[in-house]
Amino acid sequence: MSKIEKITKQLQHEQADAAWITTPLNVFYFTGYRSEPHERLFALLITANGDQTLYCPKMEVEEVKNSPFEGKIIGYLDTENPFEIDPLSFNKLLIESEHLTVKRQRELTQNFGVQHYGDIDQTIKELRNIKNESEIENIREAAKLADKCIEIGTEFLKVGVTEREVVNHIENEIKKFGVSEMSFDTMVLFGDHAASPHGTPGERKLVKDEYVLFDLGVIYNHYCSDMTRTVKFGTPSEEAQTIYNIVLEAETNAIEAIRAGVPLQDIDKIARDIISDAGYGDYFPHRLGHGLGLEEHEYQDVSSTNSNLLEAGMVITIEPGIYVPNVAGVRIEDDILVTENGYEILTHYDK
């Protein structure tokens, strides 16, 4: 069943007339056309019989025509009301309620005469959760480039270099490999600064005998990677090395349990129990991982409260961590493709 067929099936189930999709990444997912419209209306309308209409600024119409999208295009000028170009009326509309603004919903009510609304968010999340071969290949390439970023960063380490200098070096050098965008702000943290899980790289200078945490990702053909490595610079303290070994054991055991049909919460529990049994449970304050795809954080999460089952075609991260103030912060993260009988690790830089 195609993506559009799954949407129309949901529309029929909800007795809705159409779905209205406005999140740029979701529109891209269904159309193959990517836009950053800012304040302008950019939306995909999918009716219960499968008809598709893309609303976009008139200046983008030619680009849409050159994209994979084969539906109707309504291009509008900034001075026009796009809803008046082809007046429509719907009794019930499914919307992305997690994203659509109140202002935009009022426009739908006024212009389409919508009487009832429902949610399409979960259906789209579940569609994006299972990747096809093309998506997997894009993520695989993004993961290779993330590996290269870690290599670039570790080779640049030297006494006196700052966190920010390492970040800048990674992002400048990776452009030579065709990368134009990172998945998120690159994180490089030295020593106990890494005890802040979402710390901001700054002017801290590297000294001998501490760990360096890299957390980064690359976008390749619209798809993200997201990996973390904590690498030695010299010989860190005994406690810091103990923490590292515990985190590595937790990650290794969690990954080895991955296969289709296993509850996500079971994977989280494996890693969390290892860290807790070692006495560091209070220093592991986040879920074990999350989905990965067009965004660096996607449905589903790998957490103690998620009883949903792993499915073949999912791509998730596994990223246990221990963060002890004034001692060390260690996190190790890999991107994992779930298969019917196990898993494939997509990120490969040494641990």
UniProtKB/Swiss-Prot annotation:
Entry GO MF terms: hydrolase activity; metal ion binding
- Record's Pfam families? Creatinase_N, Peptidase_M24
Q: Which residues bind Mn(2+) 2?
A: D215, D226, E333
Top-level taxon of origin: Bacteria
The UniProt entry, under Gene3D superfamilies, shows: Creatinase/methionine aminopeptidase superfamily, Creatinase/prolidase N-terminal domain
Enzyme superclass (EC): hydrolase
Cofactor binding notes: Binds 2 manganese ions per subunit.
Asked if Metal-binding is a keyword of the record, the answer is yes
Under InterPro entries, the record lists: Creatin/AminoP/Spt16_N, Creatinase/aminopeptidase-like, Creatinase_N, Pept_M24, Peptidase_M24B, Peptidase_M24B_aminopep-P_CS
Family according to the record: Belongs to the peptidase M24B family.
Query: What name does this protein carry?
Result: Uncharacterized peptidase SH1217
Q: What is the lineage of its organism?
A: Bacteria, Bacillati, Bacillota, Bacilli, Bacillales
